[in-house]
Amino acid sequence: MNVTLLIPARYGSSRFPGKPLAPINGKPMIQHVYERASLAKGLTNIYVATDDDRIKAAVEGFGGKVVMTSPEAASGTDRINDAINQLGLKDDDLVINLQGDQPLIDPTSIEQVISLFERHPGEFEMATLGFEIVNKAELDDPMHVKMVFDNNNYALYFSRSRIPFGRDTQDYPVYKHLGVYAYTRKFVQAFAALPLGRLEDLEKLEQLRALEYGHKIKIAISAFDSIEVDTPEDIRKCEQRLAVD
């Protein structure tokens, strides 16, 4: 199975401009993401998908590969779709979408989503990762997306609110979403052509579009958390984690 991992990266983040190039222990964040991903088994190729020449130069500077995408891409999925069209992938090729703000992603977590497609061929069109929340401060933080899934690990819903709500108890597991997706090239193209979903627009969560249009999302539960960098403070958290790794 041909497996291409793409790391979408844009320079103009509203909360943290230039985020992909923010230094973490002397290396740009995008390099940490790329190098972590390269440790995962089963990948055919890795590319950073960007529309910014500064990011392109940084990636090529450490020996990484880049595919330049249109600056008109309205979403991360549009950027991924643009990249796979340029790369000429086949319909049944597997695409891993690793968010470029996860410099501490564990390589085995990437392997988990790949193995879902290997073990359950044809049963679903999209897969992603979850992690049981340990830090209670994340429960009501809208930057940490929560998720619920059925007994077969198919996603039921994703929300910025705490889900599920325990009416009579606070002692129950809550899972958050980790920003890794896997899907076939054929599905990415079909997904990108779908109109914006109502729930997707409310929560500002692209994965809800798949659920709204009746597509299955298989969930793998990772044993490893992954810090998502949204603010400069998150950079310091990453450096603290790396100091003890």
UniProtKB/Swiss-Prot annotation:
Secreted listed as a keyword: no
CDD domains: CMP-KDO-Synthetase
Protein's pathway: Bacterial outer membrane biogenesis; lipopolysaccharide biosynthesis
Record flagged with keyword Membrane: no
Subcellular location as annotated: Cytoplasm
Gene Ontology terms: cellular component: cytosol
Predominant subcellular localization, coarse grouping: cytoplasm
GO terms (BP aspect): lipopolysaccharide biosynthetic process
Keywords: Cytoplasm, Lipopolysaccharide biosynthesis, Nucleotidyltransferase, Transferase
Catalytic activity: 8-amino-3,8-dideoxy-alpha-D-manno-octulosonate + CTP = CMP-8-amino-3,8-dideoxy-alpha-D-manno-oct-2-ulosonate + diphosphate
GO MF, one example: 3-deoxy-manno-octulosonate cytidylyltransferase activity
EC code(s) of this entry: 2.7.7.90
Recorded family membership: Belongs to the KdsB family.
Chain's role: Activates KDO8N (a required 8-carbon sugar) for incorporation into bacterial lipopolysaccharide in the Shewanella genus.
Protein name as it appears in the record: 8-amino-3,8-dideoxy-manno-octulosonate cytidylyltransferase
High-level lineage: Bacteria, Pseudomonadati, Pseudomonadota, Gammaproteobacteria, Alteromonadales
Gene expressing this chain: kdsB
